[in-house]
């Protein structure tokens, strides 16, 4: 990224993204099933750069439903560049974690789908649309059945995400 693009992304963070990218420390949550399914998340590895080199993990929901999947980033050559919103969030990780010790960051995307068991029997008390609505509502409480994750995600991070989702690999 050119310097003016970096400045644009920082302004974008402070003006728009700030407040919608709240990290959840993995140490503070046992079960990621409470998160909304079919959303894009980043799992972040934050490693202190000072003497202790302490490592912490967090999850950040990418606010794509608010800002869209792509962000137009202007450039000095007159062309607009397009960035994935999750890449913008990755770039802004030092701003998101600004009140913490200086660190290096690794972030990888994942999303999961919860089970929505829908039994379509011939119950005359409910119409098909009511049954589908009940199935969609039960999905909020369902167990994750599928996880999609960045192919570059290190194995140890995959294990952390899968364990917190109670999903076998």
Q: What is the predicted function of each stretch?
A:
Residues 1-169:
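N-terminal non-catalytic structural scaffold regions of very large proteins
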């Amino acid at each position: 990224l050119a310097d003016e693009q970096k400045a644009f992304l920082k302004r974008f963070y402070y003006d728009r993204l700030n407040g919608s990218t709240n990290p959840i420390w993995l140490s503070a949550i046992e079960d990621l099933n409470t998160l909304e399914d079919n959303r894009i998340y980043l799992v972040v590895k934050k490693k202190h750069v000072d003497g202790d080199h302490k490592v912490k993990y967090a999850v950040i929901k990418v606010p794509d439903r608010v800002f869209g999947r792509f962000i137009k980033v202007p450039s000095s050559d007159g062309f607009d560049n397009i960035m994935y919103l999750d890449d913008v969030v990755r770039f802004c990780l030092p701003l998101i974690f600004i009140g913490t010790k200086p660190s290096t960051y690794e972030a990888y995307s994942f999303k999961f789908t919860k089970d929505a068991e829908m039994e379509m029997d011939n119950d005359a008390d409910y119409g098909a649309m009511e049954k589908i609505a009940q199935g969609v509502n039960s999905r909020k409480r369902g167990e994750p059945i599928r996880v999609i994750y960045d192919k570059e995600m290190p194995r140890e991070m995959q294990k952390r995400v899968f364990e917190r989702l109670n999903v076998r690999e």
